[in-house]
Structures are given as structure tokens and as C-alpha cells.
């Protein structure tokens, strides 16, 4: 069985806080950029676990359409503010779906922010400046938020069915996904071979409760664990190497141009053009090589003959 090229994967751009990342994987055979990109995108959006509030309890409020004396916002507005809360709940301390309580009680006039919440061990609020409500003169806010780790999106109706929900709680919609945006695309690349290759470009942005690189790694592991089930369908399958080690051709492409036995004039022209390896040489079109400053017809012929002798080709226009 013909081996696939083993791609390299890396970060090409990252925000200072690492909540945004741009990643590339190459070389991939034609069609694999879309196959892998779509699978990663769907898994990132639907299956990345995170933390969210699923219910609240406010003293003096029985439902979300209540107004509270001394509080500027009604319960509906408080719920909308709570939905913006970004949490991180330590999965090493709390099991999946284990409820944690975040509390605040105050009669101090002014805004009540997420940083005012009293948190149990292993729980962190990332957007502490978020205003949850404003207390007016004579008002008192006694608020409990119920949160947990999970996946996906749950409506307030679905959350009403949870065993932890008791009378007095107001359930809300909960979005557990920490992923804000995922985009992917592909671009063709030239390796100096007749076969078509492409590059996967993946962009991921999170809410800060998980790093973009960690989210991509986790999504990959989720996919691998599911695909692994299908490898057991046949008990007797000949072991084949799908991803081979670096081939002789690949190693040859990384050879410095100094080792290609060019004349000194041709070598100097290539070096001045920023071409240091055979890979960089064949990634250029023939027109680009011809346009290299001070490269004469004799040197051009020498370079073309060398590339042809190695059974490689220049990038197509």
C-alpha cells in the first residue's frame, strides 16, 4: 500500500493570551485538508467541554419575570448578564455534571460584579469585571449561581429535568462550549512532485477558559478515540504503515543548495534570491527562477537540468 506523507502541524499565529490560534498542517494529499478541517471544526464546536451556569436563585424572586425591590435590573436582565459569565471549573476536583455554587450577598449601593462572587475551591471567574446587577438605595441582592462542567448547549427546559434542580431555582439556557469561533481552509502547495498536495489552515478562538492549542489537541483526541473503534472491525488485517517515516525524497528536498554541485555563479544567484534548500528551489515557478537577478541563460539551464535530473519539477504557474 502506498504510504501517505506524514504532515507537520504547528502554530503560525497566536494572540498574546493564547485564546486565539492559527494552525497549519502540511503536506496533505488532496482532499484531506477539508476532511480533517471539517471534522476538527465540528468536534471543537460541539464536543469541547466547558463550564456554565444552569440555574440561579435570587431571594424574593420566584421566576424570571420578577422585579426585585432595590435592584435596578429585573430577573430577566440579571439572567442575561449571568449568561455572559466565563467560568473555569477544575475537572480534577469536580466530576462531570457535579454542581458548584457561586454566591454573593450585598446591600452595598452600586454595581455587583462577577469578582464579588464567593467561589468554592477549584472554581475561577475569568471576566471579573462583568456587572451582574446594580443595587439601589435600600436594596439587597442575595444571589446563588449553580454551575457545572458539561458539553454542548442546554435550554432552560432541559435544565429543569436535572436532578439537582429544586423549587426556588430558576433554570436558564446554558452554553458549555468555550469555543467562540472555528474556521478552516486549504491552499495548494508544491513539493516539486507531480502529485497534488495541500495545506490545512485552522483558526480557533476561545472564551479564555481553555487555550486554543489545548482545544485543538483535545478535539483531535476525541476524534482519534472514536475512529479507533472502527479499527477493530477486522480481526485479521495486514499491518500497513499509513504514515511513513520521512522518505528519501523528503530528506532530499531539505538538502542545502550548496550540496547540489552548482557552479559558483549559479549558487551565488540562488543564495542572493533567498533560496537555501532544494525545497525552496522547486517551490518557485520557472518564471520566478528566470527573473532572478544576474541569472544568465547558462545558469538557468544548469538549474533546470539539475531539477529534472532529480525527477522533480518547478511549481506550476
Swiss-Prot record:
Pfam families for the chain: RNA_pol_A_bac, RNA_pol_A_CTD, RNA_pol_L
SMART domains xrefs: RPOLD (SM00662)
Catalytic activity, EC: 2.7.7.6
Catalytic reaction annotation: RNA(n) + a ribonucleoside 5'-triphosphate = RNA(n+1) + diphosphate
One term of GO molecular function: DNA binding
GO biological-process terms attached to the record: DNA-templated transcription
Enzyme class: transferase
Alphabetically ordered keywords of this record: DNA-directed RNA polymerase, Nucleotidyltransferase, Transcription, Transferase
Region annotation Alpha C-terminal domain (alpha-CTD): where it falls in the sequence: 249-317
Keyword Membrane appears in the UniProt entry: no
Source taxon at top rank: Bacteria
SUPFAM superfamilies: C-terminal domain of RNA polymerase alpha subunit (SSF47789), Insert subdomain of RNA polymerase alpha subunit (SSF56553), RBP11-like subunits of RNA polymerase (SSF55257)
Span list, region Alpha N-terminal domain (alpha-NTD): 1-234
Segments traversing the membrane: none
GO CC annotation terms, alphabetical: cytoplasm; DNA-directed RNA polymerase complex
Keyword match Cell membrane: no
Record text about domains: The N-terminal domain is essential for RNAP assembly and basal transcription, whereas the C-terminal domain is involved in interaction with transcriptional regulators and with upstream promoter elements.
Quaternary context: Homodimer. The RNAP catalytic core consists of 2 alpha, 1 beta, 1 beta' and 1 omega subunit. When a sigma factor is associated with the core the holoenzyme is formed, which can initiate transcription.
Family: Belongs to the RNA polymerase alpha chain family.
Protein function: DNA-dependent RNA polymerase catalyzes the transcription of DNA into RNA using the four ribonucleoside triphosphates as substrates.
Name used for this protein in its record: DNA-directed RNA polymerase subunit alpha
Organism the protein comes from: Mesoplasma florum (strain ATCC 33453 / NBRC 100688 / NCTC 11704 / L1) (Acholeplasma florum)
UniProt gene name: rpoA
Amino acid at each position: 500500500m502506498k504510504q501517505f506523507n506524514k504532515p507537520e502541524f504547528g502554530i503560525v499565529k497566536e494572540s498574546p493570551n493564547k485564546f486565539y490560534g492559527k494552525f497549519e498542517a502540511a503536506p496533505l494529499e488532496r482532499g484531506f485538508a477539508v476532511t480533517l478541517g471539517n471534522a476538527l471544526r465540528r468536534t471543537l464546536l460541539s464536543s469541547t467541554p466547558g463550564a456554565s451556569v444552569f440555574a440561579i436563585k435570587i431571594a424574593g424572586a420566584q421566576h424570571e419575570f420578577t422585579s426585585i425591590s432595590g435592584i435596578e435590573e429585573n430577573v430577566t436582565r440579571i439572567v442575561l448578564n449571568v449568561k455572559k459569565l466565563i467560568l473555569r471549573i477544575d475537572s480534577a476536583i469536580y466530576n462531570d455534571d457535579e454542581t458548584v455554587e457561586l454566591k454573593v450577598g450585598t446591600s452595598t449601593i452600586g454595581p455587583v460584579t462577577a469578582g464579588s462572587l464567593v467561589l468554592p475551591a477549584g472554581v475561577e471567574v475569568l471576566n471579573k469585571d462583568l456587572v451582574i446587577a446594580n443595587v439601589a438605595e435600600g436594596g439587597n441582592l442575595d444571589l446563588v449561581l449553580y454551575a457545572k462542567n458539561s458539553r454542548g448547549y442546554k435550554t432552560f427546559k432541559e435544565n429543569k429535568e436535572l436532578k439537582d434542580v429544586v423549587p426556588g431555582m430558576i433554570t436558564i439556557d446554558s452554553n458549555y462550549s468555550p469555543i467562540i469561533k472555528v474556521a478552516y481552509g486549504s491552499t495548494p502547495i508544491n513539493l516539486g512532485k507531480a502529485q497534488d498536495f495541500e495545506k490545512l489552515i485552522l483558526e480557533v478562538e476561545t472564551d479564555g477558559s481553555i487555550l486554543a492549542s489545548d482545544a485543538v489537541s483535545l478535539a483531535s483526541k476525541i476524534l482519534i478515540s472514536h475512529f479507533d473503534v472502527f479499527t477493530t472491525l477486522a480481526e485479521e488485517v495486514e499491518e500497513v504503515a499509513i504514515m511513513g517515516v520521512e522518505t528519501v525524497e523528503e530528506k532530499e528536498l531539505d538538502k542545502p543548495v550548496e550540496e547540489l554541485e552548482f557552479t559558483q555563479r549559479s549558487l551565488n544567484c540562488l543564495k542572493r534570491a533567498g533560496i537555501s534548500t532544494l525545497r525552496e528551489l522547486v517551490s518557485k515557478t520557472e518564471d520566478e527562477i528566470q527573473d532572478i537577478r544576474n541569472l544568465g541563460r547558462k545558469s538557468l539551464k544548469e538549474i533546470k537540468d539539475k531539477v529534472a535530473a532529480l525527477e522533480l519539477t518547478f511549481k506550476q504557474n
